[in-house]
Amino acid sequence: MSATSIQPLLDILFLGKALTREQTASLFSTLIQGEMNEAVMAAMLMALKIRGETIAEISGAADAMRAAAKPFPYPASSRSQGIIDIVGTGGDGFNTINISTTAAFVAAAAGAKVAKHGNRSVSSKSGSSDLLAQFGIDLTMSPELASRCLESLNLCFLFAPHYHGGVKHAVPVRQALKTRTLFNVLGPLINPARPEFMLLGVYSPELVTPIARVLQALGTQRAMVVHGSGLDEVALHGSTQVAELKDGEIIEYQLTPADFGVPQAQISELEGGEPAQNAQITQSILQGQGSDAHTHAVAINAGCALYLCGLSDSVKAGTALALNTIKSGKAFELLNQLAKVSSEAQE
């Protein structure tokens, strides 16, 4: 859309009124095509933020980003089983170990098909992509190779900038604004594999139910949107607020570590470090040699994923399956297999 054709939509925003899903998609399409100047972009993002983004607006922005993404060739057998993403918005302010990334290896080794959409760090010193790079896993693996990994190994990692090139147009504005905008919640919603199932952690308890409604609007089959006592994942150090999407309905409840059959730990026990240190921690967990707190934090998140995929009938059973999978060594074996496939492709 040209500057003149988006002006009526901007005028609606500047009056403090909400846009429709389609109108928001039009604005974000213009942005990611590089056809929106930075002053307009900043004004648009702040107008949305100050009023508060609606479900329709978040869904519309996600529609535009999904439509513009580099295609992912979805493997047939994975489609019949269904794919899950275990992902967080980041930005929770805690520098924890890489819980969701490590949980992805465990869930995949236990039988789930995991397509993890990730980026470099937002709130910690080490995001999922920072961690994977430590293991020699190629972040810019072709979509075709990633699809083959999903098919044969049950796991692939999709590096967000590799699939969403248009986001680069927003980077200078986001850096200049130095505040959260709609982009902070979009990342988990725009996985190019379009997973049927999602375990999605959010940085604020106020986002739990709205983001579940967005997933509902986007056609996600089953999901748990979680905020765990300050963390954008299921908490081992306190209660977790959940909005679960199942059979088209959203139910809200709380979970505690006891619901997973594991003891509570202190948040300080989950503190992470630089990528190299976090890689060592992940390796220890997957080898069955991690601390109880590290292992349990990963297992309860993997357990929720296994529950959502239908591989266990409760989060407690899912956690037990995750712990057994770690003990078996299968998750560590999977890490080595993925690194091997990645390095062979780079030769």
From Swiss-Prot:
Mg(2+) 2 binds at residues 232-233. GO terms for cellular component: cytosol. It is an enzyme of class 2 (transferase). Mg(2+) 1 binds at residues 100, 233. Anthranilate 2 binds at residue 174. Binds 2 magnesium ions per monomer. The keyword Lyase does not apply. SUPFAM superfamilies: Nucleoside phosphorylase/phosphoribosyltransferase catalytic domain, Nucleoside phosphorylase/phosphoribosyltransferase N-terminal domain. One of its GO terms (biological process) is L-tryptophan biosynthetic process. Pfam families: Glycos_trans_3N, Glycos_transf_3. Pathway: Amino-acid biosynthesis; L-tryptophan biosynthesis; L-tryptophan from chorismate: step 2/5. 5-phospho-alpha-D-ribose 1-diphosphate binds at residues 88, 91-92, 96, 98-101, 116-124, 128. Its cofactor is Mg(2+). Keywords: Amino-acid biosynthesis, Aromatic amino acid biosynthesis, Glycosyltransferase, Magnesium, Metal-binding, Transferase, Tryptophan biosynthesis. It catalyses: N-(5-phospho-beta-D-ribosyl)anthranilate + diphosphate = 5-phospho-alpha-D-ribose 1-diphosphate + anthranilate. One of its GO terms (molecular function) is anthranilate phosphoribosyltransferase activity. Belongs to the anthranilate phosphoribosyltransferase family. PANTHER family: ANTHRANILATE PHOSPHORIBOSYLTRANSFERASE. Catalyzes the transfer of the phosphoribosyl group of 5-phosphorylribose-1-pyrophosphate (PRPP) to anthranilate to yield N-(5'-phosphoribosyl)-anthranilate (PRA). This is Anthranilate phosphoribosyltransferase. The gene is trpD.
